[in-house]
UniProtKB/Swiss-Prot annotation:
GO terms for MF: heme binding; metal ion binding
Any single GO BP term: cytochrome complex assembly
Role played: Heme chaperone required for the biogenesis of c-type cytochromes. Transiently binds heme delivered by CcmC and transfers the heme to apo-cytochromes in a process facilitated by CcmF and CcmH.
Any single Gene Ontology cellular-component annotation: plasma membrane
Gene: ccmE
Family annotation (Gene3D superfamilies): Nucleic acid-binding proteins
Natural source organism: Phenylobacterium zucineum (strain HLK1)
Pfam families linked to this entry: CcmE
HAMAP family named among the record's database cross-references: CcmE
Identification of the protein by name: Cytochrome c-type biogenesis protein CcmE
Domain of life: Bacteria
C-alpha cells in the first residue's frame, strides 16, 4: 500500500474524502436528474427544424406570428404559425391567448412537438408593450437579420411574413 500516505492524519483525511466523494456525486446526479424535467430550451423555428427536439420534450418555441395564420375554433382551440426568416412551425393551443397576441408580433410558445411535427403549446406568451420582445426572440431574430429593435421592419421583397 505504497500509495497511501504514511501519516495517520493524512490517511484519515484521505478516507474521509473517499467516503464523502461518492455521496456528493450521487447527490449531484439526483439533483440534475430531478431538474431535467424543468429545463426548457428555447428554439426559433429554424433552430427547431435543425435540432429536431424529441416529440414530447418540453421546449420554448419563439418567433413572429405569421400574418393570416391565426385560426380560432369554436371549441377554444387556436391554431397559428410561428415563423422566422427561414422556417415556420404550426402551433396548436387550447385556451385563452394573451390580450396582446396578434399577427406579426413576437411570441414564445411553451410546449412540445407531437409525432406529426405540430407544436402543441401549453402556454403562450406575447410581448407586453410596443418596444418589448422576449430577449431570446429578439436575439435570434437579430442574428437572422429580421429584428432591428425600433419596431420597424424593412421591406423584404418576396418575404412570406
Amino acid at each position: 500500500m505504497s500509495w497511501l500516505p504514511k501519516s495517520p492524519k493524512a490517511r484519515r483525511r484521505l478516507m474521509l474524502v473517499a467516503a464523502i466523494a461518492p455521496v456528493l456525486a450521487v447527490a449531484a446526479g439526483l439533483t440534475l436528474w430531478g431538474l431535467s424535467d424543468s429545463i426548457s430550451f428555447f428554439y426559433t423555428p429554424s433552430q427547431a427544424e435543425a435540432a429536431r427536439p424529441a416529440p414530447g420534450r418540453s421546449i420554448q418555441l419563439g418567433g413572429l406570428v405569421a400574418a393570416g395564420s391565426v385560426v380560432k375554433h369554436p371549441d377554444g382551440r387556436v391554431e397559428f404559425t410561428v415563423a422566422d426568416q427561414d422556417a415556420e412551425d404550426r402551433v396548436l393551443f387550447q385556451g385563452d391567448l394573451p390580450d396582446l397576441f396578434r399577427e406579426g408580433q413576437g411570441v414564445v410558445a411553451i410546449g412540445a412537438f407531437r409525432e406529426d411535427g405540430v407544436f402543441e403549446a401549453k402556454r403562450v406568451l406575447a410581448k407586453h408593450d410596443e418596444r418589448y420582445m422576449p430577449r431570446e426572440v429578439s436575439k435570434a431574430l437579430k442574428e437572422q437579420g429580421e429584428w432591428y429593435g425600433d419596431g420597424q421592419r424593412p421591406e423584404h421583397q418576396g418575404d412570406a411574413l
